[in-house]
């Protein structure tokens, strides 16, 4: 059993708690986003502003002295000095990365390399760098360069190399909290890369496949790392270090820094200049001269001098609240909390033994050198299905717990840990329309992001326990999704505005309608792009209103002719079009037009006699040629038909009920190699929903879709028709055998439902419709 060992004394903890008493009943667990500022810190900053006259450093030398004092404190914080590193103030860590991208001199033939698991700001550098090639490195590619790694050594970078290459990676991943071994820095600088990585772009038709003749420079994104881990620049000497001070102190925002080594300074070529970055410039010629002092050359315009001066209070507060090697102690504290949290999450299990949590990390939580104070995960149901991170965010918010969800601006780590291939990424961002920062959390049941908790020096063990209890209460005690949805909906007004919209989307919704105008042929689909479809007393308008019969007048089905699934009906305007391969035919939708020009015929559907109109020789000839069958005809139902045993439920040419409903979550549980859409098509349902929980639909007795109430008539008993791939006509037995295995020998999949009559049916029948996106309420 992993226990948390307190890092702070009782007196220290009491002092820290007093500084953050404003949290009250709230629990703050997003220190990777920003840590919190202490009360005395901002009071001291305000007192200094009241006491001192701090004006533009171009005007007042005293302000410049304050700023220089802050530079000294920053260098001291990272255990270095002004002889080895320059401090350039920027707006934030992103601006520091941009500064490097803008000004790094690749000397023609150098390459830009970046780690896959990086903040999007590093991806943005690709748009600016003037490199010969751009390469993506995985975490493992970078770790091949660890000093004690037994591998074939890369040739040392030539002393006479003319090109300069830049390697950028995070000291700590802001998604998972994994810490990169910093010993790779010196190895890369001296010997280049063992692996160049995957070429993303190249100016050459044949990009380099091995280490090139180049000087190698390292840019370290330390924004997440420096907030709670000591970065010793005497021991590890990256050429560029990007930091964000609000992540360390909580206040002020709007100021970051770029630490540049003497070596790194030699390859930054300043082009733009502004404000106090020059000794002189002539307006009538191009002549100008940059400042001699390095940081003065790169700090364009007036610095945010008030914010910079307030950093002094941040350093002082940290040293006062966590005395004696502050950042080292903070590192031990947050790692201990993360280790405890991760262990407790592993213990959370459903009654059937299934784990509640899937964790995302590379190396576990035993080694502080490899893992920071961050835990990323997703919640799962007792059947192994994922709970959307948006729902978890809502539950946390209602328990007054602040945490982070999504991809955390680290889409590369998201792609790696969630195992999203490029095709899935396209489906998420291009087809489904997800954007960074939204609450689009599941696509076909698979997560598009995660939940993250991260800890700071003011985080207490009680905060972690409260978070863990929230998960237990929400997902182990309240196991049914409908109960959770009701809990969230009842308190939705208490949620932040960004989450209120997500709360409205928790209930399952109607995803798709499928109309089968011609019995046993392909579906005509209605989804969110096409909107709504009318209802009649028999079901969806035009559903199974036509059928193909053989020369004996018997209904033709896919059991006898699998090619029927390749006939694609389309309803276009006032016409029904039938398409097969490259050919097509059409006929009017109007029943009166068809009846006036057609002969009456009789056939049977499921042993019931039906009456219809023959649709004529033209379509019959087309069907015969398409299917390769003689004597086939197309009939259209002409009279109402009732379900067996009832005079109330009117049917089209369906086998048993007005509607067949299938849950995509249930289909996903079958886990076939074909696409989910292909498997859904096998079941030939009219109404497709996605509850997130497999086979939940089998427990329904009634449901309301939009404003329309339905009753459940029972489960659909399946036959070998579902073995036919509806896109190819090929047969395979896996679908039926899998269902039989999962349902203990029962061939049930999907449910039959019928619309309950209402007082307005006769008056408003033409206005009754189902709309994709309608909320589904189960009773």
UniProtKB/Swiss-Prot annotation:
Sulfurates the molybdenum cofactor. Sulfation of molybdenum is essential for xanthine dehydrogenase (XDH) and aldehyde oxidase (ADO) enzymes in which molybdenum cofactor is liganded by 1 oxygen and 1 sulfur atom in active form. HAMAP family: MOCOS. GO terms for molecular function: lyase activity; molybdenum cofactor sulfurtransferase activity; molybdenum ion binding; pyridoxal phosphate binding. Residues 624-779 form the MOSC domain. Its EC number is 2.8.1.9. The active site is at 409. Pathway: Cofactor biosynthesis; molybdopterin biosynthesis. The modification N6-(pyridoxal phosphate)lysine is found at residue 247. The lineage of its organism: Eukaryota, Metazoa, Ecdysozoa, Arthropoda, Hexapoda. It comes from the Eukaryota. Its cofactor is pyridoxal 5'-phosphate. Belongs to the class-V pyridoxal-phosphate-dependent aminotransferase family. MOCOS subfamily. It catalyses: Mo-molybdopterin + L-cysteine + AH2 = thio-Mo-molybdopterin + L-alanine + A + H2O. The gene is mal. The modification Phosphoserine is found at residue 732. InterPro entries: Aminotrans_V_dom, MoCF_Sase_C, MoCo_sulfurase, MOCOS_middle, PyrdxlP-dep_Trfase, PyrdxlP-dep_Trfase_major, PyrdxlP-dep_Trfase_small, Pyrv_Knase-like_insert_dom_sf. This is Molybdenum cofactor sulfurase. GO terms for biological process: Mo-molybdopterin cofactor biosynthetic process; molybdopterin cofactor metabolic process. Keywords: Molybdenum cofactor biosynthesis, Phosphoprotein, Pyridoxal phosphate, Transferase. It comes from Drosophila mojavensis.
